[in-house]
Swiss-Prot record:
GO terms for biological process: fatty acid biosynthetic process; phospholipid biosynthetic process. NCBIfam families: plsX (TIGR00182). GO terms for molecular function: phosphate:acyl-[acyl carrier protein] acyltransferase activity. PANTHER family: FATTY ACID/PHOSPHOLIPID SYNTHESIS PROTEIN PLSX, PHOSPHATE ACYLTRANSFERASE. HAMAP family: PlsX. It is found in: Cytoplasm. Its EC number is 2.3.1.274. Pathway: Lipid metabolism; phospholipid metabolism. This is Phosphate acyltransferase. It comes from Bartonella tribocorum (strain CIP 105476 / IBS 506). Catalyzes the reversible formation of acyl-phosphate (acyl-PO(4)) from acyl-[acyl-carrier-protein] (acyl-ACP). This enzyme utilizes acyl-ACP as fatty acyl donor, but not acyl-CoA.
Amino acid sequence: MIRISVDVMGGDYDPEVAIAGAAIVQKYLSNIYFLFYGIEEVVKPVLKKYPCLDSISRFFPTESYTRMDEKPSQALRNGRGKSSMWYAIEAVKNGEADACVSAGNTGALMAMSYFCLKMLAEAERPGIAGIWPTLRSESIVLDIGATIGASASQLVDLAVMGAGMFRALYHTEKPSVGLLNVGVEEAKGLYEIKKAGMILREVQLEGLEYKGFVEGNDIGKGTVDVVVTEGFSGNIALKTAEGTARQIAEILNSAMRSSFLTSLGYFLSRRAFRTLKNKMDPDRVNGGVLLGLNGVVIKSHGSANANGFASAIRVGYEMVNNGLLKKITADLRRFHENKETLFDQEDEAAMSGESL
């Protein structure tokens, strides 16, 4: 039985969405159990609508919940030992749950998770990994906003963790990995990116196949399974892609309804447009994973619908079911055992210069 703790107060439309998402998941995952955390007078009436969850869940009332506008430090100070988010995370720490899912404030979720669960001994810093729809299938992109800036060693950590997540979700023995850069040539990019590329080429880590540098336009193509970058550029890439998807949808909707002929064309092509809409639907690939922590924590989009929240729960389930933490820990340990040797062998002349 895989136990999922759920902060049912975090999202824009919670607790309805979180509980409805759990009800969807239980239809196709038989060995799952939920621990719901939230304000009793708000959550109990919603739970009554879903009797299918009665035998596979337990509700725990909390004093408060974390608001979307709270700063991480404020949320941690106010929510520790009180909020639904804190208790959902603490359940993982105490071994009462195997994974935590929340649609709440990202900064607060990261701060509470970091404070409560601590880091894996082998990881230098956390990262948020997101599932990205591509022309080929799906890719994983990380870090998409946990921290700003990263050293070469930290970028390699992200590569190892991202590859582990891809293996857990898609059962690919050796996912392909690329470092996001301003060009594919080895001489281009910042020092830390070039240094990380050198390490990944030399170390030949088990469980991933390093393909070199990739550019921004390679993300949507699905050129590699895992795209690695630091949180600043990763978050910009994510927000740009989301904005572009909305822009395309609005332009198409306006164009297809501009005249009788275009409306007729839309009617005749509606199946193709439905396929396009489903492919670009963020709820289909909802569920960012907070990697590097000593526990599995999943971040759902705050605006996700029930199907989207169900997707986030499924991601958490797969992470646990496939032993993500043990595999990542072993992979990181192998890298760090050889790290000093690799750094000593670094060719400073070849790696010099930080200009584009």
